[in-house]
Design a protein with these regions (language model features):
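N-terminal presequence-like segments and the immediate start of the first folded domain
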Residues: 1-58, 62-75, 81-130
Length: 130
């Protein structure tokens, strides 16, 4: 099986040795995104779970678009929250606006102790190539 590695100019610059996405076996595995600004990754992440969730999902959209995909192609999502109890409901409200009600992917959400760049939410996903 061959793999295709995607480094995309419109997505936030990687801060470690990874690809934005790797395509293999008809699936596209998208690296976890934080609420960083793709135009200037030196800027701090926005305050609050709503703003961070929007920015993370917008960054994921950039990666998907760069791979010729959209949220309708997503089949699995993993979400990491630094304060699960405080942020879960608000994150869900924003998250739900990015996926059609009849095309919501499988999902796992977990609480973690810390994320890079003092982020409070990180999301990665798997999409399928139609």
């Amino acid at each position: 099986m061959q793999a295709m590695f995607h480094l995309l100019p419109d997505a936030p610059k990687p801060v470690a040795p990874y690809s934005h996405a790797v395509e293999a076996g008809g699936f596209v595995f998208v690296t976890g995104q934080l609420a960083t600004d793709p135009a200037d990754d030196s800027l701090p992440v926005p305050d609050g779970i709503e703003a961070q969730t929007r920015k993370v999902l917008d960054n994921l959209r950039r990666v998907l678009t760069g791979c010729g995909l959209a949220f309708d192609h997503v089949v699995c999502v993993r979400i990491f929250l630094t304060d699960f109890k405080r942020d879960y409901a608000a994150m869900n409200a924003i998250y739900a606006t990015y996926f059609a009600a009849d095309r919501r992917p499988a999902r796992t959400t977990v609480g973690v102790t810390q994320l890079a760049r003092d982020g409070i939410v990180e999301i990665d996903l798997i999409a399928v190539r139609p």
